């Protein structure tokens, strides 16, 4: 398929921003073999600027460990009890508010920040388990999401296992799930 994008270059002054904008436009394309038309309209520009702002904030958020972990309990209808919790990463931007995990995880994967972000979050989960042993008496495990890019990083899995040992937590407390963002791309390749 052919992609044609027309951009008013007077709006984009720096080549790096132009390249980022073109990459942003290409990621908007639908997956089909037909001709692709991507609107270069105000809505698209606002989406691009939003992502650029989040991208700028990511380095600070990782460096200062500003990500939060929310725990979502999962209820078993048959057993009539909570069996597990899912650890979910969240990011609050000072002016944009809550950033969708789909946005910040995609940016972290694209810019090589996902392993550092994931490890910071994993340590928080281990600390939470260690500080709240009464919770683990009531549930069986905590689900933790991993990006395929984390798993492909040499030594990363061993680092997670060492962290579990460091906090003296049974390995059985964890269920690891692979996120869909990059996993989908691998399955389509």
Q: What is each model feature region?
A:
Residues 31-32, 60, 64, 76-78, ...:
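Nucleotide second-messenger and two-component phosphorelay signaling modules
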